[in-house]
């Protein structure tokens, strides 16, 4: 009987394929900012937003100019970090970098659409920076209409360190806002799901109807509004007027020297 030795090859190759799938993602780096610094272009800002997908709450955009000599250790795409890690890095970023935040309310999102509202907030965040940047990196496909050069980077929050820092600031700020909204709108669980369309949120919508903080263009919200008609529309309170984050400096911040390479 002749054995086919090639039949064993897939088994030998299998561990290699598994290793490729389990490989850790490359962390965001400061290389693009460093390249601009070498060309004499500074300050350089990164900006990103949080909250494009939820059924409720605002879109929060952040812009960050990192200090090349004081970069906190551990900055990365906010989606790769735990809530605890994001909170700690938020404080360190605000203590060492120039930071600004802008918020697009649900009313603006309904009026302008989610893309335009997001771009509006991103531009306002850049304009609100304490120092005007000479170059801006923005996450996504769309460049901003800024006074300086703007470079859109797809997946930028996992590539460009300044964008990653902005993603952390935007995410933490929005999460805190949603926890505050939970106090005004009990029963919806905003503090848990942050406005996303999880089953618990959809159930609350069906039982209680939408609030002024829900985005009407989403089908579940529109359906809940129709069910609970006639709907008494309360005056919309602009809870999101602030465009800048107040920062509190920390005495000691761990610096990531490797990020400066």
Curated annotation (Swiss-Prot):
Cofactor: Mn(2+); Mg(2+)
Domain named RNase H type-2: residues: 42-230
Chain sites annotated for binding a divalent metal cation: 48-49, 139
Recorded superkingdom: Bacteria
GO cellular component, one term: ribonuclease H2 complex
Region of interest (Disordered), ranges: 1-23
Keyword terms, alphabetized: Cytoplasm, Endonuclease, Hydrolase, Manganese, Metal-binding, Nuclease
NCBIfam families given in the database record: PRK00015.1-3
Name of this chain's protein: Ribonuclease HII
Originating organism: Bradyrhizobium diazoefficiens (strain JCM 10833 / BCRC 13528 / IAM 13628 / NBRC 14792 / USDA 110)
Gene giving rise to this polypeptide: rnhB
């Amino acid at each position: 009987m002749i054995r086919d030795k090639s039949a064993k090859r897939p088994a030998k190759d299998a561990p290699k394929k598994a290793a490729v799938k389990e490989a850790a993602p490359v962390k965001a780096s400061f290389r693009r900012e460093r390249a601009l610094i070498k060309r004499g272009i500074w300050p350089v800002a990164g900006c990103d937003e949080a909250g494009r997908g939820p059924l409720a709450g605002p879109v929060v955009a952040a812009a960050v100019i990192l200090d090349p000599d004081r970069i906190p250790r551990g900055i990365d795409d906010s989606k790769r970090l735990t809530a605890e890690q994001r909170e700690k890095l938020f404080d360190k970023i605000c203590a060492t970098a120039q930071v600004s935040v802008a918020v697009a309310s649900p009313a603006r999102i309904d009026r302008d659409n989610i893309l335009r509202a997001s771009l509006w907030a991103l531009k306002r965040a850049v304009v609100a920076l304490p120092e005007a940047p000479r170059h801006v990196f923005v996450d996504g496909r769309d460049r901003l209409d800024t006074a300086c050069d703007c470079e859109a980077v797809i997946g930028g929050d996992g590539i460009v360190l300044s964008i990653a820092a902005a993603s952390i600031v935007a995410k933490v700020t929005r999460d805190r806002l949603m926890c505050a909204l939970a106090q005004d709108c009990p029963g919806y669980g905003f503090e848990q799901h942050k406005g996303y369309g999880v089953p618990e949120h959809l159930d609350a919508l069906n039982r209680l109807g939408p609030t002024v903080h829900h985005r009407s263009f989403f089908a579940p919200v529109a359906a809940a509004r129709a069910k609970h008609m006639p709907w008494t529309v309360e005056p919309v309170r602009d809870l999101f007027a602030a465009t800048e984050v107040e920062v509190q400096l920390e005495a000691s911040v761990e610096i990531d020297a490797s990020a400066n390479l």
